[in-house]
Amino acid sequence: QSVKESEGGLFKPTDTLTLTCTVSGFSLSSYTVAWVRQAPGZGLEWIGILKSSGSTYYASWAKSRSTITRTQNTVNLMBSLTAZDTATYFCARITHGYLGLMDVWGPGTLVTVS
């Protein structure tokens, strides 16, 4: 069971970021998947989640600018970037609760906004 993020890269403010989280070994109809990020020198910050039902929930700051969608085996994040969005972005599987135990993590992908 694994998840893996697509490649990040170098972006400019106002660019649209599109990241894909590819899952294997489990079904998105049975698990919630979260997108989280970690800016340099900072802690983890959640962006949003996609529940097994297909419902999405977002952090307050992300509601107006982020969209999470899914296909059969991917969870996709689209985000309108600002200069403060440089971070390593991760997807993770949640096993319990709204933002409960995240037991399967991707390696992360670095997004630089400059």
From Swiss-Prot:
SMART domains with a match to the protein in the record: IG, IGv
Residues annotated as domain Ig-like: 1-107
InterPro entries: Ig-like_dom (IPR007110), Ig-like_dom_sf (IPR036179), Ig-like_fold (IPR013783), Ig_sub (IPR003599), Ig_V-set (IPR013106), IgHV (IPR050199)
Key words of the record: Adaptive immunity, Immunity, Immunoglobulin, Pyrrolidone carboxylic acid
Gene Ontology cellular-component terms listed: extracellular region; immunoglobulin complex
Listed GO biological process terms: adaptive immune response
Modified residues (Pyrrolidone carboxylic acid): Q1
Keyword Metal-binding applies: no
Note: This chain was obtained from antibody to type III pneumococci and was isolated from the serum of a single rabbit.
Name listed for the protein in its UniProt record: Ig heavy chain V-A2 region BS-1
Species name: Oryctolagus cuniculus
Lineage of source species: Eukaryota, Metazoa, Chordata, Craniata, Vertebrata
